[in-house]
C-alpha cells in the first residue's frame, strides 16, 4: 500500500456505544503492481462493503469474544473457531517436551562457531527451507553444558516461533551428533507411541493446519505463536497405523 515498506497496515474506524466490532481482512484485495500494490476503485468498494456486513473476509465479533482472544484484531483468530476434528486432541496431550531454542547473542555465536567439521551444529530459522533442514548446518567448537537442554533430539518437530508462513520440519539427529537450536524455534519432542512426527508435520502444513496456526497467531508486523496457545491447539489424531500411512505418503 505504501512505497518503501513491507510493513502491514491496519485501519481502525472508531464510534461510540458499540457492543461488537466488525473485522475486515483486505490483505488479498489489491492489484499487484511492478513495484507497489494498489487499490482499484472496485477494491475500495469491496472493502467498504465488507465493513457493513459479514462475508468471506469480514465478521462481526462481540466484545466478549474479543476479550477471550486478548483483544486481537486479527480476523483469522475468529474464523472457524467451531472447527471440529474427528478424534481431535489437544497438542499438549501428545507432547513429551517443548522448549524454545537457545537465546545466543551474535558475539556468543562468533565464539562458538567452528571452521572445522565437528559433531556439533547450530540450527537457525534460515536453515529450514520447504520443510527440510539443510544438511550443511554451521559447526560449533563446543556446546556449553547450560545450553545442552536446547539441543534437538531425533524426530523432534521444529516450528518457527515468529514470522508467517511458519516453518515446520522434522529433525534427523544421528547418535553422536548434537544440534543446538536457536531461540526463534520451538523444539517439540512428541510421544511417538501416540503421534507420528511426520503426520503432525503433514497436518500443520495442510490447509487446515495453516488455518489453525493462524488462529493462534498474535501480532501483525511480526506474527508470533505463544507456547500456551500452541499447547492447546486441537489436532486430529487418528490411529497410529493410519498416521503412519499418511506420513509415508507425505514423505513419499
Positions of predicted regions on the chain:
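Sequence-specific dsDNA recognition surfaces
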Residues: 37, 92-111, 126-154
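A short glycine-rich beta-alpha junction/loop motif
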Residues: 12, 76, 115, 178-186, ...
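AMP-binding (ANL) adenylation modules
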Residues: 1-4, 112-114
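Non-catalytic DNA-recognition/assembly elements of restriction-modification systems
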Residues: 50-109, 232-252
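A short beta-sheet element
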Residues: 124, 143-205
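PDZ/PDZ-like peptide-tail recognition elements
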Residues: 108-109, 115, 121-124, 200
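Short glycine/serine/proline-enriched coil/turn segments at secondary-structure junctions
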Residues: 2-5, 131-132, 149, 177-179
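Flexible, glycine-/basic-rich loop-and-beta segments that form/coincide
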Residues: 2-75, 79-85
Amino acid at each position: 500500500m505504501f512505497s518503501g515498506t513491507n510493513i502491514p497496515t491496519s485501519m481502525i474506524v472508531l464510534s461510540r456505544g458499540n457492543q461488537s466490532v466488525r473485522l475486515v481482512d483486505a490483505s488479498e484485495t489489491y492489484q499487484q503492481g511492478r513495484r507497489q500494490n494498489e487499490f482499484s476503485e472496485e477494491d475500495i468498494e469491496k472493502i467498504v462493503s465488507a465493513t457493513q456486513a459479514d462475508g468471506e473476509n469480514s465478521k462481526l465479533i462481540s466484545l466478549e469474544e474479543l476479550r477471550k482472544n486478548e483483544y486481537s484484531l486479527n480476523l483469522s483468530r475468529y474464523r472457524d473457531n467451531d472447527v471440529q476434528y474427528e478424534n481431535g486432541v489437544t497438542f499438549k496431550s501428545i507432547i513429551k517436551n517443548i522448549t524454545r531454542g537457545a537465546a545466543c547473542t551474535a558475539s556468543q555465536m562468533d565464539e562458538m562457531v567452528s571452521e572445522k567439521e565437528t559433531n556439533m551444529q547450530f540450527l537457525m530459522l534460515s536453515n529450514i527451507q520447504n520443510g527440510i533442514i539443510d544438511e550443511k548446518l554451521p559447526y560449533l567448537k563446543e556446546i556449553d553444558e547450560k545450553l545442552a537442554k536446547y539441543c534437538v533430539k531425533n524426530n523432534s518437530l521444529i516450528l518457527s516461533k515468529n514470522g508467517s508462513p511458519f516453518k515446520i520440519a522434522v529433525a534427523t539427529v544421528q547418535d553422536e551428533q548434537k544440534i543446538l537450536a536457536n531461540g526463534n524455534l520451538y523444539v517439540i519432542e512428541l510421544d511417538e507411541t501416540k503421534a507420528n512426527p511426520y503426520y503432525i508435520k503433514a497436518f500443520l502444513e495442510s490447509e487446515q493446519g495453516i488455518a489453525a496456526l493462524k488462529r493462534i497467531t498474535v501480532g501483525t508486523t511480526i506474527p508470533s505463536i505463544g507456547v500456551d496457545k500452541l499447547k492447546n491447539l486441537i489436532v486430529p489424531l487418528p490411529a497410529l497405523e493410519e498416521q503412519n500411512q499418511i506420513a509415508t505418503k507425505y514423505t513419499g
